[in-house]
């Protein structure tokens, strides 16, 4: 029996993966799916892809493209979420700071270098006209690490998906002082070269099962209640999140949008240059559009 390992963050975006893996659709073909939760985010998943510790990973777009440029040989087999990710801008709940304009220095808690929490600070700096060269970063691994590291007297910012942190904001364990959306589709499905060689077309069949499941979720009236229960979220929050979220439901990739996204990443310093799409996309398994 072959084991196909899939890694993603333990967040509501990945509910389609959790359910498809539970169904084990390829047992009769000698392949068992294994879902691995990685709370430390995209930077850690890029590391796992490089080390062949996972076969697939659901990674933030900007984080994978930066790591690809740095030598990660894995490839994007499709998008998972086509809409932007809305990042909450958080501080210690008892901090006296209530707005970004009150900050004199711009210090960030991040899961790791190259993660979304790191790279989105550059997006925020551009929006707020901060000097990106003067940003400082402390690595804290994940959300629990941020909660432990925060100090009410030290105004450090922590960027994390808005609805994932909402329960802590509601309990006044975190303070959210703003939001910043990613300027591009947020999640890509990435496969290692070894997994593409080992599993072949089955990986694309799995991707298409995810697309089918995601399509059903977006039209199923029970989705709000189901995701709220699975991830301990309020139904009103899930409903708001679903209204601004668009899961990918097919293998199409807009080359215009991708090009504009990479140009923006280059301007921010996330990328040094725009890589050729044929180098990081499995173009033979995708439908490329204008």
Residue map of PLM features:
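Conserved C-terminal helix/tail region of periplasmic/extracytoplasmic solute-binding proteins
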Residues: 266-290
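Short, surface-exposed recognition loops or helix-turn segments adjacent to catalytic cores
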Residues: 135-143
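Secondary-structure end/capping motifs
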Residues: 198-272
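Phosphate-coordinating loops and pocket residues in cytosolic domains that bind phosphorylated ligands
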Residues: 105, 170, 282
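Short polybasic/polar patches that bind polyanions
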Residues: 27, 68, 126, 170, ...
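Short, glycine-/small- and polar/acidic-enriched structural segments
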Residues: 2-130, 137, 156-162, 174-181
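Pocket-lining segment of extracytoplasmic ligand-binding domains
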Residues: 142-228
């Amino acid at each position: 029996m072959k084991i196909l390992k899939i890694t993603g963050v333990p967040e509501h975006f990945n509910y389609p993966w959790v359910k498809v893996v539970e169904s084990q659709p390829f047992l009769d073909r000698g392949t068992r799916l294994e879902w691995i939760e990685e709370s430390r985010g995209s930077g850690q998943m890029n590391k796992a892809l490089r080390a062949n510790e996972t076969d697939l990973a659901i990674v933030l777009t900007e984080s994978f493209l930066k790591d690809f440029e740095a030598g990660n040989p894995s490839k994007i087999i499709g998008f998972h979420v086509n809409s932007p990710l809305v990042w909450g801008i958080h501080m210690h709940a008892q901090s006296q700071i209530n707005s970004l304009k009150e900050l004199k220095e711009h210090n960030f808690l991040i899961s790791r270098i190259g993660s979304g929490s790191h790279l989105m600070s550059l997006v925020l700096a551009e929006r707020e006209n901060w000097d990106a060269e003067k940003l400082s970063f402390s690595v804290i691994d994940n959300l629990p690490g941020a909660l432990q590291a925060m100090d009410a007297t030290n105004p450090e910012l922590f960027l994390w998906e808005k609805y994932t942190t909402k329960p802590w904001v509601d309990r006044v364990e975190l303070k959210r002082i703003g939001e910043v959306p990613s300027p591009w589709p947020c999640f890509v499905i990435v496969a290692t070269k070894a997994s593409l060689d080992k599993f072949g077309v089955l990986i694309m069949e799995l991707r298409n099962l995810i697309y089918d499941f995601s399509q059903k979720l977006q039209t199923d009236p029970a989705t709000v209640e189901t995701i709220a229960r699975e991830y301990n979220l309020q139904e009103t929050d899930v409903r708001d999140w679903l209204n601004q979220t668009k899961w990918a439901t097919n293998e199409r990739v807009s080359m215009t949008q991708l090009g504009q996204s990479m140009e923006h990443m280059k301007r921010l310093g996330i990328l040094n240059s725009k890589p050729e799409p044929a180098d990081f996309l499995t173009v033979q398994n995708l439908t490329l559009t204008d």
